[in-house]
Each structure stands twice: as structure tokens, then as C-alpha cells.
Amino acid sequence: EKFNCIRPREYDGSHIQFFGMNPEIALRPHQRNAIAHILYGHNTLLAHVVGAGKTYEMVAAAMEKKRLGLCSKTLVAVPNHLTGQFASEALKLYPNANILVTTQRDFEKTNRKRFCAKIATGNYDIVVIGHSQFEKIPLSDTCSTGTSILMPMQSYTRITAQ
């Protein structure tokens, strides 16, 4: 007989306390669970429908990871037209957060290196950047060729094919 013996892990975020979050905003249970998944699962796809609260999930998870010392700052790449909206929602959820929002001018050729240095050295909680701007940040040879991503996937394919 065949049966499904793989069950996805379920995350419970009901115990998580969010220090510094706007007390007038209450996260819904599915948002708390998604944040727990981000904190404990290390890789997470937020595939909720529009309006389900993905922005709050990302912001709260980023702030909690920083508070716990799991990261020093989070860079969030969003569609270009959503950078301002994302930052606005982030500040609504965490009014005291130090958020850097990129503009088109920041990534003009003459300003790009200086701005990347500002991202690297600044004490920001979250950096919000547009997709087209993110593509202009130079990557190491390993990252740009996809070698670090491709190798584990090849070994995974070999293991499952046997």
C-alpha cells in the first residue's frame, strides 16, 4: 500500500512576544505562526493571498530576529513601486524602527558605491530596496553564478532519484 508519510511541520507563534511593536496592532494567529516559521524554519515562502498580512509578517520577523541576535539587519527586496508602501507599513507596526528606504537616486551610477557602504555600515533594523536596485548590487562570483545554490540542489536530485 502507498500512503503519505510526510507531514509538513506546523509552527505555533502564539507564545512570541513582540517588543517595540505598536500595541494598537494585533497580529492574527496565521501571522504569528508564519513568523514562528521564519524564526525556526530558516527558509519560508509567504504565499498568502493579497491582504493577508505578509508585510507585517516580514517586518515582525525581521525585528524579532534582530532582537534575538539572529541577524544584524534585514534587507527586503520588493517590487519598485512598493518600497514606500512597505516602509510606511513597517513604521506603522514598529514606530521606533530604524528603516532605510532606497530611492532611484541612491542607485545612480555615481551614488551606488557610497549607498552600498551606507547599507553595510549603518545601524539599520531593515533596509527596503526595489528589485531593480537590488540587481545593481555586485555579488561575489560564487553567488552570481549560482554555484552555491546549484550544488545542493544537484545532490538533492541525486539522492531522491535513487
Q: Could you tell me what each predicted segment is?
A:
Residues 13-26, 42, 54-162:
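SF2 helicase/translocase NTPase motor core
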Residues 2-47:
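Pre-Walker A segment
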Residues 47-49, 77:
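Residues at the beta-strand->loop junction immediately N-terminal to the Walker
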